[in-house]
From Swiss-Prot:
Annotated Sequence repeat ranges: 53-129, 143-220
Source organism of this protein record: Tetrahymena thermophila
Disulphide-bridged cysteine pairs: none
One Pfam match: TBP
PROSITE patterns linked to this entry: TFIID
Name of the protein in its database record: TATA-box-binding protein
Predominant subcellular localization, coarse grouping: nucleus
Length: 246
């Protein structure tokens, strides 16, 4: 009798295991389908829509104390007004950048359009200071912030976007015309305007900028203004029919 009960119990459990395996397979298929869909959507974003880098802020430690008055007197394109700002402001034409040089030996470089140019400019500033007579070293160069901008080519309904994404959105049109959108789990901040213009800031790499744009593009895609004629052509090209809110 015990062997019969065991066989019956085993027989009853077998279909449940097969169902669980089947469900697991279905879930994996769904995950793969979702991932492939996202990859396809990202590939369908035109290259010219991706953000162009507008400003890169980097820092470096020159590892020596600096006499800012001497630097301002002996270097070209340098100005120093300690009553206004406690740093020498120095400029380069190639690459077109501005450096803030502090007495502690810390330096901030702004205005470069690429990571390479930011590094190259910082090294040029360091050499200028070295030629003046300071024992400069080039240490701890780091990109602190990358700013990019783009135009998604369709107008956006900011009111509906703000209603559906309250956790991520700060929108006060009386104070600032754009919507401030903070990326979840990142430090990237997006300024989104009704015209479709977007500014992205807070990234450390170009890859961070592109990934943030890929995410926000498909969010904004669902908030196109309904009366935008160009959206229909865009939808046909992508073969996608999103829900559009007016």
């Amino acid at each position: 009798m015990s062997s019969d009960k065991t066989s019956q119990q085993t027989f009853k459990l077998a279909p449940n295991n097969s169902v669980a395996q089947s469900n697991s397979i279905d879930q994996n298929k769904n995950k793969n389908n979702i991932l492939s869909t996202i990859e396809t959507m990202d590939k369908s974003i035109s290259e010219d829509l991706y953000p162009k880098l507008q400003n890169i802020v980097s820092t470096v430690n020159l590892s020596t104390k600096l006499d800012l008055k001497q630097i301002a007197l002996r270097a070209r394109n340098a100005e120093y007004n300690p009553k206004r700002f406690a740093a020498v402001i120095m400029r380069l034409r190639d690459p077109k950048t501005t450096a803030l040089i502090f007495a502690s030996g810390k330096m901030v470089c702004t205005g470069a359009k690429t990571e390479e140019d930011s590094n190259r400019a910082a090294r040029k500033y360091a050499k200028i200071i070295q030629k003046i007579g300071f024992p400069v070293q080039f240490k701890d160069f780091k990109i602190q912030n990358i700013v990019g901008s783009t135009d998604v080519k369709f107008p956006i309904n900011l009111d509906h976007l703000e209603q559906d994404h309250k956790k991520f959105v700060q929108y006060e049109p009386e104070i600032f015309p754009g919507k401030i959108y903070r990326e979840f789990n990142t430090k990237i901040v997006l300024l989104i305007f009704v015209s479709g213009k977007i500014v992205l800031t807070g990234a450390k790499t170009r890859e961070n900028i592109n990934k943030a744009f890929q995410k926000i593009y498909w969010v904004l895609y669902n908030y196109q203004k309904k009366d935008y004629r160009g959206a229909n052509l865009h939808n046909q090209n992508l073969n996608i029919k999103p829900s559009i809110k007016n």
